[in-house]
Amino acid sequence: MKKNLKDIKVAVVSDPIYSLGGQEKHLLGILEAFPNADLYTAWYDREAIKEWFGDREIKTSFVQYIPFHKTLRHFFLLLLPWAYQSFNFRKYDVVISISIHFAKYLRTRSSHIPHVDVCLSPPKFFWQHADRNLTGPEKLKEGVNKGLYKFYHFFVGGPLEKIWQRWDFNAAQRVDYMIANSKTVQERIKRIYKRDADVIYPPVEVSKIKINKAKRENWFLYAGRLETYKGVDLAVKACIDTDVPLKVAGKGTCLEEIKQLVKNSNAKGKIKLLGYVSDAEKYDLMRRAKALIFPSKGEDFGIVPIEAMAAGTPVIAYREGGPTETISEKNPKTGILFGKYDYKELAKILRKFDSDDFDPINCRKQAEEFDTKIFVYKMRAYVEDVLSNY
């Protein structure tokens, strides 16, 4: 029986919400598609996310009330499967999880309630060793001792790893419908979970970003989290090598490392670390920049390049993952993809780069294919189809 979307009860379940990034924008897009949905998560940081989520009611698990759950969040990963299985969803018509970790572990406890998982990626700390954020005790929050690190590493990266992988695999099999956020993740889901997934690209607020058709300023931009896996060090090294100006917008665990890298170079003030910037400030930087540098390795999708193209700005990105699906290198040309993950390779492109080779209108048109309104339409149509056929 077909149900009107206005009448259905929807639960949206997210991984812990404690920062503002691409995953949180994706979550907001789902909430825009289903404005009356109830939002669940294991735990959240109200102050850290208030800019985007305001005073919205968020239902939480027992983890929210455990002391130090924010500062020791790596260790509380071990509790999250139970946290998500503790929720009761019997009053809902459909449950939508958005997961990169454990949100999909939930149980609807009813064969009449379909579970749709928007999978941003299978957990990389289980399945992709090289992409683990925590590679040693020095990466932990200051004050956490090596004993705690060894405890964490034993349970996640040690002899129990196969058990966690099996548990994760089984959780994925319980999901009724899977949505991947890119073809890259779709292939990963097939390889790891042996499941088919439909692709719905994440929402990007293209309509809120003004395009700049005028001449660009003579500096490059890196915008995003300052993490090794995002390649911020690669961007900085390449700009130091070519002696070109770079503005770095964002914060993360690599900040001190990047500061030291700049300090030890002959950058002569050309590398500017701006720290956290608001969306409005970020969009302004994008409109003025010569190009966005996006050297992220194994990127699942990548919202930032779409935002840059919406501003009419071309993108220089690593040829892997999401950017290969979103950036066009010909007819029309909206960016350049480099194939060797090496700062010298990136430096070669920066030396020859000319923003006049790119039409801002073409960049904008490319970005419009990923606008939030398209995502909202596709998500509503998908859930409506699920409820009609479940």
Language-model segment annotations:
Residues 123, 139-178, 186:
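Membrane-proximal helix-turn-helix segments that form the acceptor-binding/catalytic region
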Residues 204, 210-230, 236-247:
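Conserved donor-binding/catalytic core segment of Leloir-type glycosyltransferases
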Residues 256-280:
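Nucleotide-activated donor-binding/catalytic signature segment of Leloir-type glycosyltransferases, i.e.
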Residues 276-277, 284-289, 379:
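Short alpha-helical donor nucleotide-sugar binding micro-motif in glycosyltransferases
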Residues 297:
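Aromatic "clamp/platform" in nucleotide-sugar-dependent glycosyltransferases that forms part
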Residues 314-317:
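Short hydrophobic beta-strand element within catalytic cores of glycosyltransferases
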Residues 355-384:
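A charged, aromatic-enriched C-terminal amphipathic alpha-helix characteristic of glycosyltransferases
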